[in-house]
Each structure stands twice: as structure tokens, then as C-alpha cells.
Amino acid sequence: MKYHVNEKRAIGKRSPMLYGHFIEHFHRQIYDGIYDPGNKLSDEEGFRKDIIEAMKKIKVPVLRWPGGCFVSSYHWKDGVGENRQSFFDKAWRVEDPNTFGTDEYIHMCRKIGCEPYICTNAGTGTAEEMSDWVEYCNLKNEGKYAKWRIANGEEQPYN
């Protein structure tokens, strides 16, 4: 069997979203990595400017988070607002301070210029918890979680 490739004939377009990246709370990907408040290389929100610029340069189209094994024990409500709850991550066996959460992730995606792709916790989470997260991120101002986002300084939905 022989195939002939006609490079002048396009049969469709490839979505740039096929070539995304992900970050996870593993070793130094986030803490002491892309998110490092107090580091001289970090901006006013704690994001490493050099890493943000590198991600812009390679044109990351979509960034998945909380990504990998970490998501199976991540409870988003503990990483939002003023009273954050640290937790022991069973996958990586480390204490996570939860200082990088939903709002920080969305801010980071905006700085990079990429689409956020939020993974949900199907390991120890519930469908209701996932639904609450959708409300927090996407509803304008109806519901307690949308109002919580507004109280946290984000007037507009993230979608």
C-alpha cells in the first residue's frame, strides 16, 4: 500500500489546545518554583517573572491544574480565601500550605496568556464539591460560592 501526502490540501485544523501543559504540587513545580512569594525574581503576586516569561515564549495554549496524583486529595475550598487549611498530601507525602489555590492559578494563567483547565478531585472529592467549584469559577453573582469569589476580590467570573 502506498500513501501520497498532498501538503496543499488541508482536511481540517488542529486545535492548539492539544498541546497543553500541566503543573502539580510536586517537588518545586509550584512552591519555590513558579510561585515563590518573597523571591527577588517574583512579582507582587508571588509569581516568578522569569518562569512566566518562559511560558509566554513557548506559547503555552492551555495549562492543567491541580494535575497529576495531587488532584485526588485536593479540596479546592481549603485553598481559597483568607483562612486556608494546609493538608497532608498522601500522594507525595508532604504538607501542602494551600497558599496556591484557584485564584492564584487563574491569575497565573492570565499572566501567561493561556486557557485554564481545572481538574477535579474524583479520588476523595464529591460531585457536589465539583459543582461548587464550577459555581465559584463561572457564576456571575448567584449562589454562595460565586459570592465567595466576589468577596475574595474577583468581581467577574473566570470563564
Region locations from a protein language model:
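Non-catalytic accessory regions flanking glycosidase/transglycosidase catalytic cores in CAZymes
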Residues: 1-159
